[in-house]
């Protein structure tokens, strides 16, 4: 989920407020859904009717944790509530039903709460758009064949699912827990059915990546390339995607005069060459995306199992050849043994084979790159790092999933982007130490935090990375700028930054 400063639910509305249709029903995941239509200033909270304008404290029940947390749900000041409503975690599940006309609502349901929010008949009012966003596959397992999809099927709600969430559901189908596997399969079938019936929205806007959400929503309303940009302004002949080594591909692009901009993706070494040569060639625009060294931060009370599963998925998928792969753990010493144990238990499930099945790990793309990996592993051993498992397979271009417990961040394997299925473990004592060592990295592309608590919030505000993923992995959106800082790149693609990069305005 997002850091606290950027928590998703945003209401774009006119400032003219009035009491609107109150129809909010709050129910646990094991309860039957009922649709309430209330004409007064009340709503159902915990299956009881309450007046929204009387200050009252409610008990927030979490079915997965079987505990109660007390919080203020509604109070008198809601009359003057600003058009920015937050609904994120169990500590922020504020129930509201003060609605204004001419606005769109985006509700984000935290994967930690295990709680469903069912809104009855809101579309029957003047509300134009109600979208419920589920941020991870886990709650969808619970919702897949039950309440929320029934509301989508009968047209009560416009239900949105992010493309990445659908991908995570597919990943959950590999779970060893039969109940999770079956529920994920049902969820995928149901989503496809609703999609083909135009009852579910494929949501490109991603609310999990820390960024300025207001800009993303504003960009959603802007013109689209396909329908509004005239071909004479951006002709196809001026857009090319050459791939290859620096001397044969990148450098000729710089000297090609008709090109107005060069968007580079590749190594930091060649990126430096491109950035030096570009100004010499008719002052071309250049954006550089040159990889990173991203870490997964795991602290006290964090979800170690989730962190291990998603880190292995992010690193071992594509043999680690992904720029935002979370190629290392930064762990509190209290979680170190559990991290190591969980990784060693799960590693054998990643099979090496040439097949293209989704649960198979294939070979390296380039042999020359593969040949550099054993040298880096041997270098780690020479620097007193412990290689706990993995390594190259003889007479092949395969590398078994490799786990290395690193003592210092001065090790070569910690300082360089290895671009391989290798996970390092760096142990720290405090959050401040994690921030200091994380920011010492020469890269600044992405970072991952496993929990939205105090540690997660502190890390999210202090780590010097462009992308911060909280309780999610490998999310991307056309609406959110993508790029890096430090040695991870210069400039950004996608979102508003793409409009700035690929257009020239008349002032």
From Swiss-Prot:
Name the Pfam families on file: Aldedh
Gene Ontology CC: mitochondrial matrix
Give the active-site positions: 289, 323
- The residues that hold NAD(+) are 266-271
Where does the UniProt annotation place the signal sequence? none
Record has Transit peptide as a keyword: yes
> InterPro entries from the entry?
Ald_DH/histidinol_DH (IPR016161), Ald_DH_C (IPR016163), Ald_DH_CS_CYS (IPR016160), Ald_DH_CS_GLU (IPR029510), Ald_DH_N (IPR016162), Aldehyde_DH_dom (IPR015590)
| Known EC number | 1.2.1.3
Catalyzed reaction equations:
an aldehyde + NAD(+) + H2O = a carboxylate + NADH + 2 H(+)
* Source taxon at top rank: Eukaryota
Question: What's in the keyword line of the UniProt record?
Answer: Mitochondrion, NAD, Oxidoreductase, Transit peptide
Enzyme type, top EC level: oxidoreductase
Q: Which GO terms describe its molecular function?
A: aldehyde dehydrogenase (NAD+) activity
**Location in or out of the cell:** Mitochondrion matrix
Give the residues annotated as coiled coil: none
Q: Where is the transit peptide?
A: 1-21
Q: In which pathway does it act?
A: Alcohol metabolism; ethanol degradation; acetate from ethanol: step 2/2
**GO BP annotations, alphabetical order:** ethanol catabolic process
Give the family from UniProt: Belongs to the aldehyde dehydrogenase family.
Q: How does it assemble?
A: Homotetramer.
Q: What is this protein called?
A: Aldehyde dehydrogenase 1, mitochondrial
The organism that produces this protein has a lineage beginning with:
Eukaryota, Fungi, Dikarya, Ascomycota, Saccharomycotina
